[in-house]
Amino acid sequence: MEGGTLTTELLKYFGCSSEIASASAFVQQRGKLNAMAFSSLFDLFVRNTDSYKLYKGFRLLAADGSEIQIPINPGDPDSYYPGSNGQSPYNLLHLTAMYDLLQRTYTDADLCGKKKANERAVLCSMVDRSSLDNVLLIADRGYENYNLMAHIQEKGWSFLIRIQDVSNSRGIAAGLDLPDSQEFDLFVDLSLTTKQTNELKKLCKNRNQYKHLHKDFDYLPKTNRKHDPIVFYNLPFRIVRFKISEDSYETVVTNLHVTTFPPQELKKLYNMRWGIETSFRELKYTVGLLHFHAKKVEHIYQEVFARLIMYNFTELVTSPVIIQKADCKYAYKANFSVAVHVCRQFFLGNVSPPDVEALIRKHVSPIRPGRSRPRKMTAKHAVSFIYRVA
């Protein structure tokens, strides 16, 4: 569905038939569906449309999360915030996703109330249940975590995760002895443990070789008795700091080999992570994720996963459309907004497959690499049921 009222969308789909079901009847029927039915459809769609591209032998996946404000529902304690200091109450869901940067499709997604959100734990679960091989997982500072790095290592994947910079007193970098230079590439071979003894305290003086973890770690014992032997988990990685502008730097950790992936290559790869940020914007505003047609959270789950399927379908249809014109400065790609509309018309039976590709090829936009602008952080709100496009 698009951004109109539920009645408008039903009239649009059924062709203004006088026998059309009412909005109330539609809501009652959708209530009979399992809340996770569309999640299963999304997983099935991903498995059956998995034709990926590789970069230096790796499949590039980005992980990130995004908050979704939904219609106010005090009856859902996992997402409801009463507001404070004069702020109106609101409900938030949290979407965690893995996104293929070269195929430009979502490979996995998890949705829950904001109060229950734990991005790192969710991503660990996504890594564990994935059937993919030769993956390089790229993530931002929210995923700086030894436990997550271990899950990725155990899976046989590679990781590239941005961490808090060396100037920050917290985080992975703060617990290591690093070079004094502005830029560096240091290999660290850490032995992690959750046990605390006098012997271990002496070992931990070598901060680049031994590390005591205060939190639970999935690959170490949950409890440690006094006479139990010390158990270590080995986690080798590089910590790399590189310049991104005249006066700013980024620090990342990775288990990629330095010969194939020197610092400049890591910088390029991490910059590619922006593709998942762009996908969230298109998912919300082009595909219409913010235009819900329900208040019940289980119905909203259906709509979120339906739009993820729609996003993936549109990207798969448009991905072959890259046009290089000899007399033009830029290569051209499909206009995603037009492509979404054409794909919707295809599902409605108004456009045949040959015309879908022809229409998409007719509406293209130039590819302008290297552009950037300051990111404006503003509050996002669910679109009211009252103010909808007719």
Regions found by a protein language model. Give the residues of each.
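Conserved beta-strand elements of the Class I
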Residues: 59-61
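Polyanion/phosphate-binding surface patch
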Residues: 8
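Extracytosolic and intramembrane catalytic regions of membrane-associated proteins
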Residues: 81
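Glycine/small-residue-rich loop that forms an oxyanion/phosphate-binding "nest" at active or ligand-binding sites
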Residues: 42-47
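Single, function-defining residue in the core of a domain
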Residues: 1-4, 12, 21, 25-33, ...
